[in-house]
């Protein structure tokens, strides 16, 4: 059984037991979080596709931890002007473990 749900403007395909990195959620480590924006639920031969959401669909997950991703380096450069600017960015994420999927 797997599901596709939406969180933080992104869609994630998950199954029970999977660990997923999502955009940062303001939830403490160890707590459970429910996602009700489920777009698709598949169970063997049965597939429930939402229009746009599956009615009564829910994905339950436990927060494993929070962290920051790899550094992305940004360079702004202006030719012939002796000007360059270098910046870095590390995006916050929340890691969750999927515990239940229900239609």
From Swiss-Prot:
GO cellular component terms, semicolon-separated: cytoplasm; ribonucleoprotein complex; ribosome
Protein name: Large ribosomal subunit protein bL21
Record keyword Ribonucleoprotein present: yes
Sample GO molecular function, one term: rRNA binding
Entry-linked PROSITE patterns: RIBOSOMAL_L21 (PS01169)
UniProt KW rRNA-binding keyword: yes
GO biological process: translation
UniProt KW keywords: Ribonucleoprotein, Ribosomal protein, RNA-binding, rRNA-binding
